[in-house]
């Protein structure tokens, strides 16, 4: 037993140190914005963010003097139901957040693929800008939806990388939570 040599026993180990409370998602984005203005968009790699956290971050990004975009992936399948209004897509649409883009996917990072495509555009080059609608999302498996589910997401201004019967898949509709296409806000 080498635990004593490694000081890994109750009597030889370091005493516990009091920690600090974790910051909220909004506090994290506010700290990032205060530290650096050299970022244009953000997403969270935390699948456990509550809807309220997304609403708080979206409100911060919306109110920011610097133009930024917040991306959200909704994985809750209840968002596919037109009658369910407690998901992030429904709430953000209700608030008409023009600087927030939402996508539904079983992949919790699907919106990262969409933003990766959009944020790598060279606006100085000729014919280099893209329309986000109808694009492929590298690394994301397309969702097989019913017509009713697709209509529910569209009504919530929630994008989706959707599979079609002709063996293609596209990102639809390329809209923000507010009344605009992504391409009208980006850039």
Pin down the residues of each PLM region.
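Surface-exposed assembly/interface segments
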Residues: 1-187
């Amino acid at each position: 037993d080498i635990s004593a040599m490694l000081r890994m026993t109750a009597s030889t180990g370091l005493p516990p140190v009091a920690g600090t409370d974790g910051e909220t998602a909004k506090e994290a984005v506010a700290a990032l914005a205060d530290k650096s203005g050299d970022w244009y968009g953000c997403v969270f790699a935390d699948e456990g963010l509550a809807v309220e956290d997304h609403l708080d971050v979206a409100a911060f990004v919306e109110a920011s003097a610097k133009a930024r975009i917040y991306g959200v992936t909704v994985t809750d399948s209840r968002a596919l139901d037109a009658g369910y209004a407690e998901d992030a897509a429904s709430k953000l649409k209700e608030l008409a957040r023009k600087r927030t883009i939402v996508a539904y996917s079983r992949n919790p990072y699907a919106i990262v693929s969409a933003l990766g495509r959009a944020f790598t555009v060279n606006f100085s080059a000729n014919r280099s800008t893209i329309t986000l609608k109808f694009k492929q999302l590298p690394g994301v498996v397309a969702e097989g939806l019913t017509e009713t589910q697709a209509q529910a997401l569209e009504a919530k201004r929630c994008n989706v990388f959707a599979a079609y019967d002709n063996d293609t898949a596209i990102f639809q509709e390329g809209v923000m939570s507010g009344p605009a296409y992504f391409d009208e806000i980006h850039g």
